Structures are given as structure tokens and as C-alpha cells.
UniProtKB/Swiss-Prot annotation:
This is Non-structural protein 1. The dsRNA-binding region is required for suppression of RNA silencing. A motif (Nuclear localization signal) lies at residues 34-38. Gene3D superfamilies: Influenza virus non-structural protein, effector domain, S15/NS1, RNA-binding. One of its GO terms (molecular function) is protein serine/threonine kinase inhibitor activity. Residues 180-215 are annotated as: CPSF4-binding. Pfam families: Flu_NS1.
């Protein structure tokens, strides 16, 4: 196993522990708590994949961080912060919408890259909107936290989420996953609309009204992908 992979996991575990202590003091805002929950799942998945104990890794990560801080000067810290581009966290969904329970009458699931796509193909003739919470850097989607498809009544009928055991995805990965989700939902004569925020940063190939246009051939291809590969 690569030593950098292990040490990276150890540092991530310790930094998550610090953030958890911060949250326990009720100091974290909604995006902070959201990322904390998602990162916890990711760390559990990585720990299982690497065969490493999280508590032991956290202690080792603490030693690594302490050693770095001992060598770090205030001036170097200022220069590092100034050189790192700042990302923005954008939220289409409230915490209630993100945590809302849902079930599927006709479940379909597909994994593409490090993203998991789930949808209920029993949904027909509904107006559906896609909403997402994600971070943006350089005016492009950086990290998808969660994307969900809602009916006008507020029911969740689809979802795209990162796989905890496979961290890391690109803007193109997210765009492809959105295309698969839209294709599956539109096959049952649902009307699918993308939120303005999501359309701006992650789905630029749509019309101004947020309704992506797919030719019939592409619709059939997407539907076959959902049916045959899920």
C-alpha cells in the first residue's frame, strides 16, 4: 500500500475529528455540518477499503499535523492561504430536503465513475426539478455533495450521490450522471427541469428554461442504458 495513501487517510481522519469537536460546540453552519456528515461516510468507506482502523489512523494523523504545525511560521501560513483559490458552497436544497426519506416502487440504480444514480421509474407524467448542493471553484462545479429530483409535491424521485468508497469526481462525471438521470426520468413522460444554480455550473447544455433537450435517438439510448446496465 502506498505510504502517501495511508498518511493522507490519517490526516483526513484527524481533521475530521477536529471539525467534529467544533460542530459539537454548536459552532458549525449548515454547509459545514453537511460536509461533516458526508465526509464521515467517505472516511468509513476509505477505511474499509484500505483495511485501516479509523481511531488508530486519527491518532497517527494528529502526530503528522502537530509536526507540520511545529515547523510552520505565521508568514508561511499567510502565504499558503493567499495562494489557495477559495471555493464557494452553493445550496439548492434545505437540510430538510437533503435528509428527507424516500422509497422507490420501481427502483433503478446505476454507478458511473464514483457517482451512484438512483431513480424511481414508477413515476409518470410529473413535473420534476433537479436540485443540488455542491461547491464551486473557478466558476465550475468542484464537488457534488448531493443531487435530488423532486416532484412539485416535494417527493424525492431520484438522486445522485458520491460513493463513500470511491472519493473524487470531475465536473464531467457529474454532467454525465445528470444526463443519465434526466434520460431515465423523461422516458416515462415526466417533464424534467434543472435548477438555475445547477444549470449554470454543472449543466450548461440546456435551454434557458432549464429543460435539457434530447433528440429521440438519444432518449432511447439513455433509456436502454438505464434498463440494461442497472
Amino acid at each position: 500500500m502506498d505510504s502517501n495513501t495511508v498518511s493522507s487517510f490519517q490526516v483526513d481522519c484527524f481533521l475530521w475529528h477536529v471539525r467534529k469537536r467544533f460542530a459539537d460546540q454548536e459552532l458549525g453552519d449548515a454547509p459545514f455540518l453537511d460536509r461533516l456528515r458526508r465526509d464521515q461516510k467517505s472516511l468509513k468507506g476509505r477505511g474499509s477499503t484500505l483495511g485501516l482502523d479509523i481511531e488508530t489512523a486519527t491518532r497517527a494523523g494528529k502526530q503528522i499535523v502537530e509536526r507540520i504545525l511545529e515547523e510552520e511560521s505565521d508568514e508561511a501560513l499567510k502565504m499558503t492561504i493567499a495562494s489557495v483559490p477559495a471555493s464557494r458552497y452553493l445550496t439548492d436544497m434545505t437540510l430538510d430536503e437533503m435528509s428527507r426519506d424516500w422509497f422507490m416502487l420501481m427502483p433503478k440504480q446505476k454507478v458511473t465513475g464514483s457517482l451512484c444514480i438512483r431513480m424511481d421509474q414508477a413515476i409518470m407524467d410529473k413535473n420534476i426539478i433537479l436540485k443540488a448542493n455542491f461547491s464551486v471553484i473557478f466558476e465550475r462545479l468542484e464537488t457534488l455533495i448531493l443531487l435530488r429530483a423532486f416532484t412539485e409535491e416535494g417527493a424525492v424521485v431520484g438522486e445522485i450521490s458520491p460513493l463513500p468508497s470511491l472519493p473524487g469526481h470531475t465536473n464531467e462525471d457529474v454532467k454525465n450522471a445528470i444526463g443519465v438521470l434526466i434520460g431515465g426520468l423523461k422516458w416515462n413522460d415526466n417533464t424534467v427541469r434543472v435548477s438555475e444554480t445547477l444549470q449554470r455550473f454543472a449543466w450548461r447544455s440546456s435551454h434557458e428554461n432549464g429543460r435539457p433537450s434530447f433528440p429521440p435517438k438519444q432518449k432511447r439510448k439513455m433509456a436502454r442504458t438505464i434498463e440494461s446496465e442497472v
